[in-house]
């Protein structure tokens, strides 16, 4: 492995905003789905990736179907606590990133 010179931008930090910004920058680097999957595998445990994937799936189901929380729970096994959390972010939270991602993917929430 080739040696690299130290990056002057990399320094120990406990600042949550700086750490989050650095993570966001890293998450923007994959060029395709395979690269993103590899990055997620490096960053997250399999359980963490599964949790993220479940939240995304629930968001799509809530946005694109008339399924109830109970229906989603029974069909997916995702806890109702998680379903309620995702629903709150879809409806009330200012971020609206779930909806933005679905819009950019041309996704109304329905599975293919």
Tell where the protein language model's regions lie, with residue ranges:
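Short, Lys/Arg-enriched anionic-surface-contact patches
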Residues: 36-55
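Short, solvent-exposed alpha-helical "recognition" segments
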Residues: 88-100
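Short alpha-helical "recognition helix" segments of helix-turn-helix
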Residues: 70-76, 83
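Recognition helix of helix-turn-helix/homeodomain-like DNA-binding domains
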Residues: 59, 84-91
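Intrinsically disordered, low-complexity basic tails/linkers immediately adjacent to helix-turn-helix/homeobox/MYB/SANT
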Residues: 100-112
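The DNA-recognition helices of helix-turn-helix-type DNA-binding domains
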Residues: 65, 79, 90-93
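General nucleic-acid-binding
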Residues: 1-30
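Short, amphipathic alpha-helical "recognition" segments used to contact nucleic acids or chromatin
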Residues: 52-67
């Amino acid at each position: 492995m080739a040696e690299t010179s130290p990056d002057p931008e990399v320094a120990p930090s406990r600042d949550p905003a700086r750490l989050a910004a650095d993570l966001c920058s890293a998450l923007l680097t994959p060029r395709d789905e395979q690269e993103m999957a590899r990055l997620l595998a490096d960053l997250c445990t399999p359980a963490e990736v599964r949790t993220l994937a479940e939240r995304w799936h629930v968001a799509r189901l809530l946005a694109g179907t008339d399924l109830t929380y109970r229906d989603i729970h029974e069909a997916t096994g995702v806890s109702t606590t998680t379903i309620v959390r995702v629903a709150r972010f879809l409806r009330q939270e200012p971020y609206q990133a779930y909806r933005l991602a679905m819009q950019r993917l041309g996704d109304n929430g329905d599975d293919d």
